[in-house]
């Protein structure tokens, strides 16, 4: 088992970050946590260039409209970089009104990641490939890792775990681990009416991470439960006696915006699932 002092997600989706979070390996939100990445190389190149053009208003185009549990999410895509933003805008909170606040939020997350990459000594990056894309080559993975290492010259260790979909897997399996680049196959694709969904089953991914790595200062199970309980307490306090049925509740929306909680399409009831937000509350 290898030990790191910082782990972060490069994408492709929120499933990678959620796998780290549920093990206590990550608490604060970072740029790639709630976005859709077009590729591993696109993510590392974005890190290398300091996220230039990441959220340029002129490049954002409405890409999809998703109906989730009574909530209508408006998905925007950056047509220059290929990154998608699925969790930021809705019919009730359109981009024309929310763009500045969302941009400021991502600026905080970008600054947070930059500080960590400049100061940490043992860094792990995780990329969970899209379940509908094939595995990329070892050369592409090694090249991506080289870009990351160039960005962190002070670090003693910068490793990359690349996980891709293989429906035959009953348990995540390491295929190769050379010079800090580890390739893992796992089954995490899910289906709805015979079609692959964008939501991943993280059980095999989380199981592999739990058995393979440790993070200095990771939250224990007791701390995770306490963290979750505190978020529910703050939610109840902010809502008074109101009962929450949908994400579109006005007071819940404001609380989520303030703390950057992702609750799209979920019913919020005690014990439902952990709530995650930026650790500084900004």
Model-flagged regions — what are they?
Residues 9-73:
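Adenosine ribonucleotide-centric catalytic and binding domains
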Residues 15, 95-102, 129-138, 167-168:
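Short acidic, S/G/P-rich loop/turn micro-motifs used as interaction or catalytic elements
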Residues 125-129, 161-163:
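Conserved beta-strand segments of the P-loop GTPase G domain that flank and frequently precede/overlap
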Residues 180-232:
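Extended, charge-rich low-complexity interaction segments
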